[in-house]
Regions:
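Bacterial N-terminal signal peptides that target proteins for export
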Residues: 2-12
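Bacterial N-terminal signal peptides
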Residues: 10-20
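Sec/Tat signal peptide C-region and signal peptidase I cleavage site
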Residues: 22-26
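Gly/Pro-enriched, hydrophobic low-complexity segments
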Residues: 33-38, 43, 59, 109-110, ...
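N-terminal mature ectodomain segment of secretory-pathway/periplasmic proteins
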Residues: 33-117
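Acidic/charged, solvent-exposed loop-and-adjacent secondary-structure segments enriched in E/D, K/R, S/T
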Residues: 56, 110-146
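Surface-exposed, charged, gly/pro-rich loop-and-adjacent secondary-structure segments at domain edges
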Residues: 134-164, 235-239, 252
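Short, solvent-exposed mixed-charge patches
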Residues: 254-257
Length: 257
C-alpha cells in the first residue's frame, strides 16, 4: 500500500476511501519479512476483491494535527459500487459535507453536493488509472484505493517490509484475522479480515508514525456484496437543477504562521 499523508479536510474530493497505483500480478510466494499466514490471508482477500462487480460501505475517521498541534477527527460514511474494468461510483457523506464521484469509463465527475458544484474531466479507461490520475491532480491520497485495484493483494503489500498475524479476534460475533504490516517510511498498517473463504476486510487502520501527531486513517467496512449488478446509469452523473460546473483543482496550501 503506497501512501502519502495529506490533510484533506478542505478538499472538495477528500474521499476517505480510496493508495492507488497500476495493476500488477500478485506475488506467488511470501515477501521477505512477511509471515506465510499473513501473506496467505492477503492472497485470499485479493482473490475475493478481484470480482468484476461488488459494492461495500465504510465508516471512516481521519485523525490529523491542526496548526495548533491539536488532534482533530473527520468522520465519513462511504458507499462504493464498482464494475470492472471501467465503472465506479462513490458516495461520501461526513463532517465536511457530501461528495459523489461518477466514473463511466470515459469521464470522471466529482460533485460537491452541498455546494451544488461539479467538475468533470476526461479519464483513463480503467479504474486504477482513473484513481491515480485524480490523485495526482488533487495531490491527495485515497487510502481505500488499493481495495479497488484489479490486484488488491499486490497493491496492499506494495512497500511493505514486514507483516505478521496477531491474535484472532471476534467482530460482531464473527471470527476475524488481525494482521499487522510495516511499510518503509514509517507507515504502519493494520487490517482485520473476515475469517471465512472470502476474507473480506472488516477494519483498516493506517498510522503515519513519523509525521507530527502521528496522523491516522481508520475504516470499518460493512455490507460487502458480490452479487450486485449495477446498471450503467449508476455511473453517470446527471447534474441537478442549478448545478454549476467548475474546474478540478488541487486545494490551496495554507501558509505557515
Amino acid at each position: 500500500m503506497t501512501m502519502r499523508y495529506t490533510n484533506t479536510a478542505p478538499v472538495l474530493f477528500a474521499l476517505a476511501m480510496i493508495g492507488l497505483m497500476p495493476a500488477a500480478r500478485a506475488a506467488e510466494a511470501p515477501q521477505p519479512g512477511i509471515s506465510s499466514e499473513a501473506s496467505a490471508a492477503i492472497r485470499q482477500m485479493s482473490k475475493t476483491l478481484s470480482a468484476n462487480e461488488f459494492s461495500f460501505q465504510a465508516r471512516t475517521i481521519r485523525v490529523y494535527q491542526d496548526d495548533d498541534g491539536q488532534p482533530l477527527h473527520v468522520f465519513h460514511t462511504v458507499k462504493v459500487v464498482a464494475h470492472r474494468p471501467d465503472q465506479l461510483a462513490v458516495h461520501r457523506t461526513g463532517d465536511d459535507g457530501a461528495t459523489d464521484l461518477f466514473y463511466d469509463g470515459k469521464t470522471v465527475t466529482i460533485f460537491g453536493v452541498n455546494e451544488n458544484k461539479y467538475a468533470r474531466v476526461d479519464a483513463p479507461n480503467n479504474i486504477e488509472a482513473m484513481l491515480d490520475d485524480v490523485s495526482e491532480r488533487l495531490n491527495v491520497d485515497f487510502p481505500l484505493a488499493d481495495f479497488l485495484n484489479v490486484d488488491p493483494g499486490k497493491m496492499f503489500l506494495s512497500g511493505v517490509t514486514s507483516g505478521r498475524e496477531l491474535d484472532p479476534v471476534t467482530i460482531d460475533g464473527k471470527p476475524a484475522q488481525h494482521l499487522f504490516f510495516s511499510q518503509a517510511g514509517g507507515i504502519d498498517l493494520e487490517v482485520w479480515l473476515d475469517k471465512t473463504e472470502q476474507a473480506t476486510p472488516q477494519r483498516l487502520i493506517v498510522t503515519y508514525r513519523l509525521l507530527p501527531g502521528q496522523p491516522s486513517f481508520i475504516a470499518v467496512f460493512s455490507d460487502w456484496n458480490f452479487s450486485t449488478h449495477p446498471s450503467d446509469a449508476e455511473f453517470v452523473f446527471q447534474p441537478p437543477a442549478g448545478a454549476k460546473q467548475v474546474e478540478l483543482q488541487a486545494p490551496q496550501k495554507k501558509e505557515s504562521k
